[in-house]
C-alpha cells in the first residue's frame, strides 16, 4: 500500500456541542417561508476600483458648478464687496481648483504607499504639501 501524506486537522477536544433542535428548525423554515432574497453586494474595494477607472477616463468637472460659484463669491466678499464674475472666470477657477486637488491627492496617495498603507491620512496631505513647499 502506498504512503499518503498526512495533513494537520483542527480538533476541538472536550465534549461535543449539544444540538439545539428548536432553533435549527426555525432557521431552516424562515428563509423558505419569507422568500426574501439578500441584495447583491460587491466585495470591498471592487466598487472603489470601478469608480477610480471611471473618473480617470472622464474629463468632466466633478464639483457641482453652483456650489463652487457660491464658494468663490463668499471668499471674494471678504476682500471686496459687490464683485462681479464672468462665467468663464468662474469656470477657469473651477478647472484650476480641480486640477490642483487631483494633483494633491496623487501626491498624497504616493505618500501613503511610501508608508506601506493604502488609506490616505491627513498626515499624508501635510507631507505632500510640505514637499511641494506650500504653507501648512
Swiss-Prot record:
N6-methyllysine modifications at: 5, 10, 19, 24, 28, 37, 80
Signal peptide per UniProt: none
N6,N6,N6-trimethyllysine PTM positions: 5, 28, 37, 80
Modified residues annotated as N6-acetyllysine in this record: 10, 15, 19, 24, 28, 37, 57, 65
The keyword Repeat is assigned to this record: no
Region (Disordered): 1-42
Keyword vocabulary terms for this entry: Acetylation, Chromosome, DNA-binding, Methylation, Nucleosome core, Nucleus, Phosphoprotein
PROSITE patterns the UniProt entry points to: HISTONE_H3_1, HISTONE_H3_2
Pfam families assigned: Histone
GO cellular component assignments: nucleosome; nucleus
Post-translational note: Phosphorylated to form H3S10ph. H3S10ph promotes subsequent H3K14ac formation and is required for transcriptional activation through TBP recruitment to the promoters.
Residues recorded as bearing N6,N6-dimethyllysine in the entry: 5, 15, 28, 37, 80
Modified residues (Phosphoserine): 11
GO molecular function: DNA binding; protein heterodimerization activity; structural constituent of chromatin
Primary localisation category: nucleus
This protein's record includes keyword Zinc: no
Matching InterPro entries: Histone-fold, Histone_H2A/H2B/H3, Histone_H3/CENP-A
Compartment(s): Nucleus; Chromosome
Function, in words: Core component of nucleosome. Nucleosomes wrap and compact DNA into chromatin, limiting DNA accessibility to the cellular machineries which require DNA as a template. Histones thereby play a central role in transcription regulation, DNA repair, DNA replication and chromosomal stability. DNA accessibility is regulated via a complex set of post-translational modifications of histones, also called histone code, and nucleosome remodeling.
Subunit structure, as described in the record: The nucleosome is a histone octamer containing two molecules each of H2A, H2B, H3 and H4 assembled in one H3-H4 heterotetramer and two H2A-H2B heterodimers. The octamer wraps approximately 147 bp of DNA.
Family: Belongs to the histone H3 family.
Record-given protein name: Histone H3.2
Taxonomic lineage of the native organism: Eukaryota, Fungi, Dikarya, Basidiomycota, Ustilaginomycotina
Name of the gene: HHT2
Amino acid at each position: 500500500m502506498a504512503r499518503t501524506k498526512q495533513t494537520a486537522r483542527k480538533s476541538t477536544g472536550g465534549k461535543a456541542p449539544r444540538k439545539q433542535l428548536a432553533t435549527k428548525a426555525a432557521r431552516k423554515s424562515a428563509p423558505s417561508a419569507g422568500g426574501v432574497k439578500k441584495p447583491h453586494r460587491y466585495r470591498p474595494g471592487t466598487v472603489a476600483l470601478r469608480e477610480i477607472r471611471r473618473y480617470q477616463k472622464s474629463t468632466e468637472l466633478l464639483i457641482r458648478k453652483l456650489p463652487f460659484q457660491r464658494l468663490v463669491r463668499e471668499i471674494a466678499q471678504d476682500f471686496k464687496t459687490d464683485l462681479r464674475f464672468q462665467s468663464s472666470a468662474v469656470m477657469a477657477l473651477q478647472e484650476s481648483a480641480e486640477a490642483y486637488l487631483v494633483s494633491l491627492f496623487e501626491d498624497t496617495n504616493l505618500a501613503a504607499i511610501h508608508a506601506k498603507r493604502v488609506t490616505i491620512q491627513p498626515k499624508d496631505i501635510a507631507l505632500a504639501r510640505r514637499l511641494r513647499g506650500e504653507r501648512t
